[in-house]
């Protein structure tokens, strides 16, 4: 089933890519209307939107999905339910495609809910307590976005149709459209895990690694960014854009800090995804939708490769994800290490790799844009933190001696997994320049002073040095000492967001509920209610029973008494 799915998806991806080129070069947009029901004067029509953006994004989703399924053939080889896993992944891709090509909020909701439901099934795929908790957190966080989307559908009743794309430009200054835009922004923030909904993204790492490669690169988390790209007119012309810029900037800063304190391999990569999502959202809130789309596509390539390499390492390490137990992997797994380092360098923005073209352009656009000092600081500091945790990860996993058990057989003989990774490796090297020429056919002239041009390079070098220094033992133990304990706990736990969004949200309602139960249900209500009445009746019946047993005279007297009462009632 893996091979059939791979061939079908890769051929569909190629078709979508060629179509997107045709649409882009000829500046074409197609609306396809499909009439579902026609009854007298009423008709229900489903509309699909095909333009270069939707087709290109769809081709990337299909390509990454095909390589992930091909990779899963070996990664999930020993799993008894691999066919169920492949079916869930295909359902995931189908939901994503429905969301991409829909200009209608109702059909978007179908794809949106499909993503939420299937992602829950995939997160709890390994059935244990940790997976169930992570799945519940994921489902409930995304449910807030579903409610926001339903409310926006209700608001759109004012327009008589749910095809939002027809009304965005004309109605952009109206209160109703502003309300719809704010609700859609809330939905996108939950799906793309922006502050204060960030805690579910690292928790979702309980899913199998191929799912992480698909979900955290090109599908679930980017659905929110893609939706806001479609609603960009409202963001860029109202206060919503300023709010989004602040929240997304704080998200990428928080995720970058958290990744420097994390030791779980998959969680570090998940936090790097969160940081890049914040970068996409922030540049989108400034009105540069093509640039956000460009970074979304390049990020999908190297992040999927990074997760695949992490999966191969975990597979060889007997399911151990602690980076402190790794070391010297470049000797034992040279091909996987090469792919891992290329994807890490692309994430840092190494010149002429996929991430460089989008990240460098974003930072230069920020430098010439009218943003305040706080946002400017967040952009550049977050870039430095990205390089820092990437170099820290390379230091822990690739250098030094192997720290795991001596019985671990580390090798690079997983040829099916390696082939899947090689396809993405090529795209991670050439994808950035290829997309740059496609999306921006005429180069931008960005004229900046030399110190502003070199600021990005300087921040990256400082970040790399900091990542190396933070890994050294003396700094590490100082950081974990009681002197720095509170600060490192705060920064390493995503500013306590997982605790606030789980324990913090339910603590007071549960305590109040317990008080109500103790005071009423198990207190005076219990005394004056059923239990007290039951006890009294039991006591009286026992007393009467004893009286009947002990005295024949009383028994006969009561018998006569009840006969008299019955006769009186009978003749009244």
From Swiss-Prot:
It is a multi-pass membrane protein. Disulfide bonds: none annotated. Pfam families: NADH5_C, Proton_antipo_M, Proton_antipo_N. It is found in: Mitochondrion inner membrane. Its main location: mitochondrion. It catalyses: a ubiquinone + NADH + 5 H(+)(in) = a ubiquinol + NAD(+) + 4 H(+)(out). It comes from the Eukaryota. InterPro entries: NADH_DH_su5_C, ND/Mrp_TM, NU5C-like, Proton_antipo_N. GO terms for biological process: electron transport coupled proton transport; mitochondrial electron transport, NADH to ubiquinone. Its EC number is 7.1.1.2. The chain crosses the membrane at residues 4-24, 44-64, 86-106, 107-127, 147-167, 170-190, 217-237, 239-259, 268-288, 294-314, 337-357, 372-394, 422-442, 457-477, 490-510, 552-572. It is an enzyme of class 7 (translocase). Keywords: Electron transport, Membrane, Mitochondrion, Mitochondrion inner membrane, NAD, Respiratory chain, Translocase, Transmembrane, Transmembrane helix, Transport, Ubiquinone. GO terms for molecular function: NADH dehydrogenase (ubiquinone) activity. GO terms for cellular component: mitochondrial inner membrane; respiratory chain complex I. Core subunit of the mitochondrial membrane respiratory chain NADH dehydrogenase (Complex I) that is believed to belong to the minimal assembly required for catalysis. Complex I functions in the transfer of electrons from NADH to the respiratory chain. The immediate electron acceptor for the enzyme is believed to be ubiquinone. PANTHER family: NADH-UBIQUINONE OXIDOREDUCTASE CHAIN 5. Belongs to the complex I subunit 5 family. This is NADH-ubiquinone oxidoreductase chain 5. The lineage of its organism: Eukaryota, Metazoa, Ecdysozoa, Arthropoda, Hexapoda.
């Amino acid at each position: 089933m893996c091979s059939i799915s791979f061939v079908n998806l890769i051929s569909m991806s190629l078709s979508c890519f060629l179509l997107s080129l045709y649409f882009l070069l000829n500046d074409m947009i197609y609306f396809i209307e499909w009439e579902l029901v026609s009854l007298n004067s009423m008709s229900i029509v489903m509309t699909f939107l095909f333009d270069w953006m939707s087709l290109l994004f769809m081709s990337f989703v299909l390509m990454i999905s095909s390589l992930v399924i091909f990779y899963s053939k070996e990664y999930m080889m020993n799993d008894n339910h691999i066919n169920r896993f492949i079916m869930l992944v295909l359902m995931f891709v189908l939901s994503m495609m429905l969301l991409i090509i829909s200009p209608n909020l109702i059909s978007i909701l179908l794809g949106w809910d499909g993503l939420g439901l299937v992602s829950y099934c995939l997160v709890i795929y390994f059935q244990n307590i940790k997976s169930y908790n992570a799945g519940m957190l994921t489902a409930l966080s995304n449910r807030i976005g579903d409610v926001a989307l339903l409310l926006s559908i209700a608001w759109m009743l004012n327009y008589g149709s749910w095809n939002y794309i027809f009304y965005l430009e004309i109605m952009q200054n109206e209160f109703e459209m502003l309300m719809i835009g704010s609700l859609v922004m809330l939905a996108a923030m939950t799906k793309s895990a922006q502050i204060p909904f960030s805690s579910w993204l690292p928790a979702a790492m309980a899913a199998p690694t191929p799912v992480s490669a698909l979900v955290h690169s090109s599908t679930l988390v980017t659905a929110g960014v893609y939706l806001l790209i479609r609603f960009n007119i409202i963001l860029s012309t109202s206060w919503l854009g300023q709010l989004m810029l602040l929240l997304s900037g704080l998200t990428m800063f928080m995720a970058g800090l958290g990744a420097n304190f994390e030791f779980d391999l998959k969680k570090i990569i998940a936090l790097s995804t969160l940081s890049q999502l914040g970068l996409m959202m922030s540049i989108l809130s400034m009105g540069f939708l093509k640039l956000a789309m460009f970074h979304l596509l390049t990020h999908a390539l190297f992040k999927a490769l990074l997760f695949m390499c992490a999966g191969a390492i975990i597979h060889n390490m007997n399911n151990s994800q602690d980076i402190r137990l790794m070391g010297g992997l470049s000797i034992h797994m040279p091909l996987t290490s090469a792919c891992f380092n290329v994807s890490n360098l692309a994430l840092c923005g190494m010149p002429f790799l996929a991430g460089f073209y989008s990240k460098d352009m974003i930072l230069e656009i920020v430098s010439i844009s009218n943003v305040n000092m706080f946002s400017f600081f967040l952009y550049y500091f977050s870039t430095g933190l990205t390089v820092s945790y990437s170099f820290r990860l390379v230091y822990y996993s690739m250098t030094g001696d192997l720290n795991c058990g001596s019985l671990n057989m580390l090798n690079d003989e997983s040829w099916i997994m390696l082939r899947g990774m090689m396809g993405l490796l090529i795209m991670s090297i050439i994808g950035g320049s290829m997309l740059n020429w496609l999306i921006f056919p005429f180069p931008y002239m960005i004229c900046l002073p030399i110190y502003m041009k070199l600021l990005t390079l300087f921040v990256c070098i400082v970040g790399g040095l900091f990542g190396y220094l933070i890994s050294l033992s003396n700094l590490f133990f100082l950081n974990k000492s009681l002197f720095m304990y509170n600060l490192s706990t705060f920064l390493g736990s995503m500013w306590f967001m997982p605790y606030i969004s789980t324990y913090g949200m339910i603590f007071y309602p549960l305590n109040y509920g317990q008080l109500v139960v103790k005071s009423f249900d198990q207190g005076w209500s219990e005394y004056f209610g059923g239990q007290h009445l039951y006890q009294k009746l039991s006591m009286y019946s026992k007393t009467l029973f004893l009286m009947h047993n002990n005295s024949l005279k009383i028994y006969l007297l009561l018998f006569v008494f009840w006969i008299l009462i019955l006769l009186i009632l009978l003749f009244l």
